[in-house]
């Protein structure tokens, strides 16, 4: 994630040798970061956030182990042919067949690739449970945070692509995706079966300009919320301001201008999700096919970023900053009795940097990373007004486990002062922020199979109000991710 994504076209048209080199590097790379990201996002973001979408978002692939990198061209070639069939235009990389459980058994993928069709599917299953003895268990209907009761969630995806470059469209592609999700606790859901994406993509001017339009999930197009393949930021801070997500895609047109092979500017004109949040959006539009929902307007997003991929002696770096403006009509938390009003907005700033390379020559992306994120939105229109995150993580921490990842993430979520003051005026116990420290270890068990375990301590895991029994939580986090 901290480098130029492999499924995005290189904005500079390199020589044939450079193109071949990139193709070989991709094919030998098992997409570790993507899987780790998908695992960690759900188990951590739901650890305290009251309504986090289960759609996981994904990060780009990490380097393969030494054995894979030492493999011959004969080993690499069988999977290189699928690179053009992976979804394009994302900041993250969904894995290729080399890191799936079925790869190309029975020749099904090969036969489809011959006619320009590619596919990837995955199942993501998460579990959270507060381990403190006074966990204040409740009925599921009255559950206030993820883990208060043992909480299970599953999200299942299928993405199919069709290659239009075979007809002369530069990097052309059609993408169709579906998603099914289920939660034992419905508030972060709800359950649904529906559209994940329906998109058209192509490039212009020798890949200087990228166009993607259709029903998009912009959580995978902007912000890079799964930093370095780890837990990632709490996406709810941006979802509340209208950004579309895996379970809530909306019509959008995205344009990305590559100033060079590292510096870019990306903009989107997107139909906002419901101003009442992801739960209201999915409840009103579970299929994801409706053009709009009640009170939803237009969201404009602009992101400026700098990406530099890890190489021998060159650290992995990703810097980005963005703003968003939403014309949807929101409830005013400062005066709930007045009419809804427009003018919501948000901003975000994030940076990730490789601090040390543990395998400079063999796998330069392995090593220790650090990063931070800051997100903000007006407190009168958003329950989350500020979000801060610090992270430290190690990719390929051991030579014997070159595809694993260890992460330590600290977060602070500041709640709207108007929502807090209103709760205090009613005599309720209320808190102005939520703090969490989360540690996870994610293991790559086999091609296409990942598992993660972690602990997350959360001070005030509920949203705005709490009881003496819900001030603290120590969530056990377990997740699996299987690609096919």
Predicted features by range, described:
Residues 2-126:
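N-terminal periplasmic/intermembrane-space "pro-region" immediately following the signal or transit peptide
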Residues 96, 102-119, 131-132, 161-173, ...:
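Short loop/turn motifs that connect adjacent beta-strands in outer-membrane beta-barrel proteins
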Residues 119-127, 174-180, 211-217, 267-271, ...:
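Transmembrane beta-barrel strands of outer-membrane/channel proteins
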Residues 128-154, 166-201, 292, 461-463:
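Surface-exposed loop and membrane-interface regions of Gram-negative outer-membrane beta-barrel proteins
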Residues 140, 181-199, 206-298, 420-424:
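Surface-exposed coil loops of outer-membrane beta-barrel proteins
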Residues 276-294, 299, 303-305, 323-341, ...:
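Outer membrane beta-barrel transmembrane domains
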Residues 470-484:
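Outer-membrane beta-barrel "beta-signal"
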């Amino acid at each position: 994630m901290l480098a130029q994504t492999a499924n995005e076209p290189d904005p500079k048209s390199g020589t044939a040798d450079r193109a071949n080199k990139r193709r070989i590097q991709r094919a030998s790379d098992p997409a570790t970061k993507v899987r780790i990201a998908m695992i960690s996002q759900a188990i951590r973001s739901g650890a305290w956030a009251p309504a986090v979408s289960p759609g996981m978002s994904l990060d780009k692939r990490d380097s393969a182990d030494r054995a894979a990198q030492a493999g011959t061209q004969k080993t690499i070639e069988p999977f290189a042919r699928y690179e053009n069939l992976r979804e394009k235009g994302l900041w993250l990389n969904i894995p290729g067949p080399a890191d799936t459980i079925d790869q190309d058994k029975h020749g099904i993928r090969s036969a489809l690739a011959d006619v320009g069709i590619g596919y990837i599917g995955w199942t993501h299953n998460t579990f959270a449970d507060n381990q403190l003895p006074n966990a204040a268990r409740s009925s599921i209907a009255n559950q206030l945070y993820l883990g208060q009761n043992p909480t299970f969630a599953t999200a299942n995806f299928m993405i199919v692509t069709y290659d239009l470059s075979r007809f002369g469209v530069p990097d052309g592609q059609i993408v169709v995706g579906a998603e099914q999700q289920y939660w034992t606790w419905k508030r972060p859901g709800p359950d649904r079966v529906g559209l994940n994406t329906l998109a058209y993509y192509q490039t212009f001017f020798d890949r200087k300009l990228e166009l993607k339009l259709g029903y998009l999930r912009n959580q995978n197009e902007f912000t890079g919320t799964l930093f370095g393949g780890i837990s990632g930021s709490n996406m709810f801070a941006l979802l509340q301001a209208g950004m579309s997500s895996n379970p809530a895609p909306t019509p959008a047109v995205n344009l990305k201008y590559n100033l060079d092979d590292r510096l870019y500017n990306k903009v989107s004109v997107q139909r906002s999700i419901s101003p009442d949040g992801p739960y209201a959006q999915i409840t009103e539009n579970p299929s994801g096919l409706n053009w709009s929902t009640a009170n939803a307007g237009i969201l404009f997003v602009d992101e400026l970023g700098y990406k530099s991929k890890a190489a021998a002696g060159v650290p992995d770096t990703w810097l980005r900053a963005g703003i968003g403006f939403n014309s949807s009509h929101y409830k005013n938390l400062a005066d709930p009795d007045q009419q809804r009003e427009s003018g919501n907005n948000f901003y975000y700033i994030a940076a990730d940097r490789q601090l040390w390379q543990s395998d400079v020559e063999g796998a330069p992306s392995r090593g220790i990373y650090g990063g931070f994120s800051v997100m903000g939105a007006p407190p009168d229109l958003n329950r989350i007004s500020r979000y801060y995150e610090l992270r430290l993580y190690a990719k390929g921490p051991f030579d014997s486990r070159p595809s694993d990842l260890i992460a330590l993430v600290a977060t602070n979520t500041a709640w709207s002062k108007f929502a807090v003051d209103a709760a205090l005026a009613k005599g309720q116990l209320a808190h102005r922020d939520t703090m969490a420290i989360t540690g996870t270890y994610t293991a790559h068990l086999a091609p296409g199979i990942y598992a993660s375990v972690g602990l997350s301590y959360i001070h005030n895991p509920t949203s705005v109000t709490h009881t003496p029994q819900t001030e603290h939580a120590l969530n056990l986090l377990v997740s699996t991710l299987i690609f096919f």
